[in-house]
Design a protein with these regions (language model features):
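A structural motif corresponding to the C-terminal lobe/cap of the Radical SAM core domain
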Residues: 1-133
Length: 133
């Protein structure tokens, strides 16, 4: 696999890397997500050279993605893919799991992770308060 070969080649040469990972994107299947977790696990031998930044998919106004979602409350959106509906709670769960895995393996994570988590925790709380789950 070319990605794994590239990581190994960079790691052997002590070249720093940044992983910019997006979870919960519209076409992401459970298998895709599990491959992301496998990448994090596999790459841990080079964890001192890797900074990981993981973000949940979010809708930006006036983008093509905005056309392919619907709101289940004022602030929250979801969409369907082959695995079913992917709502904010599931995107958050994937984001949190991937970040916790990265932390448990000793990776350098995005410096503002704690602030990002606080903001997403607030959004998740509001999601549960306003959604019909």
């Amino acid at each position: 696999h070319a990605l794994y070969d590239s990581i190994e080649n960079l790691g052997k040469r002590n070249i720093k890397m940044v992983f910019l990972l997006l979870v919960g994107y519209p076409t992401e299947t459970l298998e895709d997500y599990e491959q992301t977790l496998q990448l994090i696990k596999w790459s841990h031998n080079y964890k001192n050279l890797i900074e990981i930044r993981i973000n949940p998919a979010m809708i930006l106004p006036n983008t093509p993605l905005e056309k392919y979602h619907w709101y289940d409350s004022i602030e929250h959106w979801k969409y369907k893919n082959e695995d079913g509906e992917l709502d904010f709670a599931e995107r958050y769960r994937r984001w949190d799991e991937a970040n916790n895995l990265s932390l448990s393996l000793g990776y350098n994570i995005f410096p503002k992770h704690k602030e990002q988590k606080r903001l997403l925790d607030e959004k998740l709380k509001k999601y549960y308060e306003t959604s019909k789950l």
